[in-house]
Amino acid sequence: MMDIIREMIRADVGFEDITTEALIDRGTRVVADIVSREEGVVAGVEVAEMMAREFSISIIRWKDDGDPLSGGERVLTLEGDAMDILMVERTMLNLMMKMSGIATLTRSMLQRARAVNEGIRIAATRKTTPGLQWFEKQAVRIGGGDTHRFRLDDCAMIKDNHIAIVGNIEDAVRRVRDHVSFTKKVEVEVESPDDAVRAAEAGADIVLLDNMSPETIRNTLEELERRGLRDNVIVEASGGIKPDNIELYASTGVEVISMGFITASAHPVDLSLEIRGLK
């Protein structure tokens, strides 16, 4: 992760921070606070500590990842060379704000879903920002969600385009089973109740019901139950699930709801860095 963080800082600084170089002498030590300006769930504290260590900036934690935030609360106190603190300020805040926004939205969605389905999981998708996947998925985890796949090698997930090329679900599942380790689960994305049954009969571990209405999902689960297949698979719902309908989907009885919404549409939590004084 530090390679990614270093590159972010290099991209932000360019050749030098010309304003700070003009105004502040190297060796000027300051104390600064990172403060929240609104409510939320904090995430990115450990990332901030990684950045601070890289530049010999000491940190006092007032909040840990996953803690609730109110407006005006201190999250971290930094002490170090003013030039270093000002150099990393924007990158540190950007990551913390983005991660905190995702954690906040994830926790909200999880609470809504579990109000009607106590054991349900809320999972991310791979609809993440290139280069920021790890940070965004970690934020989902901090908010209480499931990371789902980090990468393509985490789980064999047979999607509609795979099936379109191979020709049918049964052959796709068989060929994946023959190719991957027994330690990897096989998930099949389907768009109809009939295909959900076919995927379960073919031996899928997870069946993803994509872009189905809550009513169709209920009918699909009933059909799997009627055929004695329901206990053989984890059923996941995805596609078009947002804050205004998550309870409807959770109440169907699926084990997992996966949402691109929690990483793609989260509003960053407003944080600021304030220099408290010279040290």
Curated annotation (Swiss-Prot):
The gene is nadC. Hexamer formed by 3 homodimers. GO terms for molecular function: nicotinate-nucleotide diphosphorylase (carboxylating) activity. Substrate binds at residues 90, 125-127, 149, 159, 189, 210, 238-240, 259-261. GO terms for biological process: NAD biosynthetic process; quinolinate catabolic process. Keywords: Glycosyltransferase, Pyridine nucleotide biosynthesis, Transferase. It comes from Methanothermobacter thermautotrophicus (strain ATCC 29096 / DSM 1053 / JCM 10044 / NBRC 100330 / Delta H). Its EC number is 2.4.2.19. It catalyses: nicotinate beta-D-ribonucleotide + CO2 + diphosphate = quinolinate + 5-phospho-alpha-D-ribose 1-diphosphate + 2 H(+). Involved in the catabolism of quinolinic acid (QA). One of its GO terms (cellular component) is cytoplasm. CDD domains: QPRTase. This is Probable nicotinate-nucleotide pyrophosphorylase [carboxylating]. Pathway: Cofactor biosynthesis; NAD(+) biosynthesis; nicotinate D-ribonucleotide from quinolinate: step 1/1. Belongs to the NadC/ModD family.
